[in-house]
């Protein structure tokens, strides 16, 4: 399921529907293709779901679709579970892919410098610890 939630600073809505089927590869490619054409600098995508439900697969497809839009070769998109952050540069876009699964305390977040670069696109797996942040976001619930 893909759900869009409005937050105080949200500039635009990417998806207006509350439920989108991404249970198969064609559906996943369709939604990531749509998002890849609408996503803008400064957007935040928060990915919720249990282990193994497809958060990194969603991210991989989205980043590869953005690369395709810019006629760039697809790069390998891996889960940032151990290094917490993987960064991708696609022309003038900087995409930061975070996995906050191992972050347990708010103080640890401060070391990550989340949201400091207003033009970065942030894709965040396991964003539950961010509840104290007021950010504009698009939330993806898998599972």
Task: State the predicted function of each range.
Residues 2-5, 18, 105-106, 115-143:
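Short phosphate-coordinating micro-motif centered on Lys-Gly-acidic
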Residues 9-34:
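N-terminal pre-Walker A segment at the start of P-loop NTPase domains
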Residues 45-47:
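Hydrophobic anchor at the beta1->P-loop junction of P-loop NTPases
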Residues 50:
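P-loop (Walker A) phosphate-binding loop of NTP-binding proteins
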Residues 55:
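Conserved lysine of the Walker
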Residues 64-76, 90:
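Post-Walker A helix-loop "phosphate-sensing" segment adjacent to the P-loop in P-loop NTPases
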Residues 81, 85-128:
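Conserved nucleotide-sensing/catalytic segment adjacent to the nucleotide-binding pocket
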């Amino acid at each position: 399921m893909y759900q869009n939630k409005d937050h105080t600073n949200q500039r635009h809505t990417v998806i207006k529907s509350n439920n989108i089927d991404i249970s198969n590869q064609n559906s996943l490619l369709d939604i990531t293709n749509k998002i890849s054409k609408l996503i803008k600098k400064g957007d935040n995508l928060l990915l919720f779901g249990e282990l193994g439900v497809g958060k990194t697969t969603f991210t991989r497809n989205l980043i590869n679709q953005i690369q395709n839009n810019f006629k760039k070769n697809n790069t390998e998109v891996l889960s940032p579970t151990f290094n917490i952050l993987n960064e991708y540069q696609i022309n003038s876009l900087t995409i930061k892919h975070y996995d906050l699964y191992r972050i347990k305390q708010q103080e640890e977040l401060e070391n990550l410098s989340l949201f400091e670069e207003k033009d970065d696109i942030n894709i965040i797996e396991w964003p539950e610890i961010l509840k104290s942040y007021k950010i504009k976001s698009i939330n993806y619930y898998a599972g």
